[in-house]
Amino acid sequence: KGEFITAYFPAERKAEFAKPNGVENIKLAEVYNTTENAGNILLKYMVHMKTQQSFARNEGDKEIVERIQQWFDRFESALQVLLDEKSIHLEYDYKNYNFKIRQEGREPFEFSELSDGYSSVIYIVSDLILRMDKNWLLDEEISQYNAQGIVLIDELETHLHIELQKKILPFLTKFFPNIQFIVTTHSPYILNSISNAKAYDLEKHVELENLAAFSSDELAEGYFEADEYSDTLKEELERYAQLCSGKELTEEERAERAELKIKFKNLSTDLSGAAREKFED
């Protein structure tokens, strides 16, 4: 009953928000199965909520009005973060039973006009929201989206530009604090976007921790072997070699050498074997 959430989002996911033809009495399911598309009724659900808010306002039920407004405020805040635009606001087109997104400097646009990346992310968020919302409707209080659960997302980076890859996992884990997210990815920007996570290489059968300590370049070129090792590491290794060969170092140079030595000693052999080998030489 929304108390434990399970969901799976495949790599080839396509966001489809069913457009309302009018007001519908949307009933959220007690339980959604793992692959069921709960998010596709988002717009219908929002129209239903606005209608209920209007009825409550007419009846003088301020508590319901405020609770529903809190829901919209929180969803709007999520859009502002995900779309990286603080001017984002939801606009209800009551004549056409639809919602549009208003952004400073452009005409209001529909959810269907979002790019594949933004659409995909908002779809995941809305799907999980609707899986949990049964709770607060029953308890007559605003949901904190703190239900426990396990969510699988295949190739999380699909359609996402770099900045969105960096923020998506931190956003999901903050918005849904009790959900365990298990994701597959080839993106270094996702791998180092969060500190309290473990990574497992399915090819090498290696478990890695705290990849947030490494730059995206180090992960991309060192771990993913896009190059023998990263350009940054190359420069640092050359600098370290230069400092090691120097005889009369300043206090600042000795401190820099010690700092680099500690960094290279802590490099995982699985993360950047070539760089470590170079250091040991």
Predicted stretch roles:
Residues 1, 75-86, 128, 132, ...:
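Hydrophobic, Leu/Ile/Phe/Ala-enriched alpha-helical segments that form helix-helix packing faces
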Residues 65-73, 118, 230, 250, ...:
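Generic detection of long, well-ordered alpha-helical segments
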Residues 83-90, 136, 275:
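Long, hydrophobic, amphipathic alpha-helical segments used as structural scaffolds
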Residues 86-102:
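Long, charged, glycine-rich C-terminal linkers/tails
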